[in-house]
């Protein structure tokens, strides 16, 4: 903008769409990126990819990045104010990673797969089991407005741990069933 200096850092604050847009802008501008998620509904703050949408809510483009996010700041007190439906969506998205990896092609073993894919599968299985056990308690704590250890752990799982799994997979070798379903709904029902 007329004589303005180029930014030295970009800060993205918001939900998945805003964070994905911030990642795309930071990559294009080649500036460091700090992300501050306001929802635990996605792993957008941690995953090295951006999903860009049209005004109508349809997926236009998916960008994959080689560079990881420079910094992520998560404030559990902020996340505790999100609607329970967003936390539930994040839990289901995180749990879906295991199912997606299992149904993304050939059997994954340490012997026949890239080692990062093998470890992503193991991590996704642990994540699935953890959220199966703790997810409902976290939702109840959120509904009561209590910032408990379980809720904090689920926030971490939805944002960071799921993002690590996504980063290891690099968007390959997983069915991404949850995303296909979401994109269909979003395209036909933009309010979702």
Which residue stretches match the model-derived regions?
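Glycine-rich beta-strand-to-loop/alpha-helix junction loops that act as flexible
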Residues: 13-15
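Conserved beta-strand elements of the Class I
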Residues: 9-11, 34
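Active-site segments that bind and position negatively charged phosphate/pyrophosphate groups
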Residues: 112-192
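A glycine/threonine-rich phosphate-anchoring loop and its flanking beta-alpha core
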Residues: 27-122
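ATP/NTP phosphate-donor binding region
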Residues: 1-8
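Short glycine/serine/threonine-rich phosphate/pyrophosphate-binding segments
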Residues: 17-23, 43-46, 174
